[in-house]
Amino acid sequence: MDASKLKKVAGKKFGGPRKKSVTRSIKAGLQFPVGRIGRYLKKGRYAQRVGSGAPVYLAAVLEYLAAEVLELAGNAAKDNKKSRIVPRHLLLAVRNDQELGRLLAGVTIAHGGVIPNINPVLLPKKAAEKAEKAGTKAKSPKKATKSPKKA
């Protein structure tokens, strides 16, 4: 390159095409904003100092949890033959997963409803017997045999 053809720009040696900025999210291969999370960590005054790896790690953890919940909620929506995830699907996804259920045990999801559950003791006996038969293999009915008469 000929230096005489390029204009001199204030603060830089020569002007020219600007480099595309590479964010820390791109470097880490994440979708969640590492810079914004770092700013929140500093502003929140959780500690006097924040290490450079802390926002990257936190962004990765948050992204993983979000992806996990969304995948399970998408499966719940598909099971209900719906194409849109609603709070009910989020609740079903979280409560039916053991680890997420423990993590979010004290969390109330607005408009999520409750997990359907009926205690077997409260079910009518006929329904309970049918449920038991459905659970086990149905056997073919045997011919009734008379018991011997007592003399």
From Swiss-Prot:
This is Histone H2A.2.2. The nucleosome is a histone octamer containing two molecules each of H2A, H2B, H3 and H4 assembled in one H3-H4 heterotetramer and two H2A-H2B heterodimers. The octamer wraps approximately 147 bp of DNA. Contains 2 SPKK motifs which may interact with the minor groove of A/T-rich DNA sites. Phosphorylation of this motif may regulate DNA binding. This motif is reiterated in both termini of histone H1 and in the N-terminus of sea urchin histones H2B, but its presence in the C-terminus seems to be unique to plant H2A. A motif (SPKK motif 1) lies at residues 140-143. CDD domains: HFD_H2A (cd00074). The lineage of its organism: Eukaryota, Viridiplantae, Streptophyta, Embryophyta, Tracheophyta. Residues 129-151 are annotated as: Disordered. Belongs to the histone H2A family. Core component of nucleosome. Nucleosomes wrap and compact DNA into chromatin, limiting DNA accessibility to the cellular machineries which require DNA as a template. Histones thereby play a central role in transcription regulation, DNA repair, DNA replication and chromosomal stability. DNA accessibility is regulated via a complex set of post-translational modifications of histones, also called histone code, and nucleosome remodeling. Coiled coil: none annotated. Its main location: nucleus. One of its GO terms (molecular function) is structural constituent of chromatin. The modification N-acetylmethionine is found at M1. It comes from the Eukaryota. Pfam families: Histone (PF00125), Histone_H2A_C (PF16211).
